[in-house]
Swiss-Prot record:
Residues 1-45 are annotated as: Disordered. It comes from the Bacteria. InterPro entries: Ribosomal_bL34 (IPR000271), Ribosomal_bL34_CS (IPR020939). The gene is rpmH. One of its GO terms (cellular component) is ribonucleoprotein complex. GO terms for molecular function: structural constituent of ribosome. Residues 32-45 have a biased composition (Basic residues). GO terms for biological process: translation. This is Large ribosomal subunit protein bL34. The keyword Ribonucleoprotein applies. It comes from Dichelobacter nodosus (strain VCS1703A). Pfam families: Ribosomal_L34.
């Protein structure tokens, strides 16, 4: 049996997928602009 790999933590979640993490890099800003263009209700977690 393999262990459950999802060990939830809000801090690591925000740090890797949060809005400021997206804004920090050029590619992250591209992600946000794509999600805005698509009309996503939530841009980030």
């Amino acid at each position: 049996m393999s262990k459950r790999t999802f060990q939830p933590s809000n801090l690591s979640r925000k740090r890797t997928h949060g809005f400021r993490a997206r804004m920090a890099t050029k590619n992250g800003r591209q992600v946000l602009s794509r999600r805005r263009a698509k009309g996503r209700y939530r841009l980030t977690v």
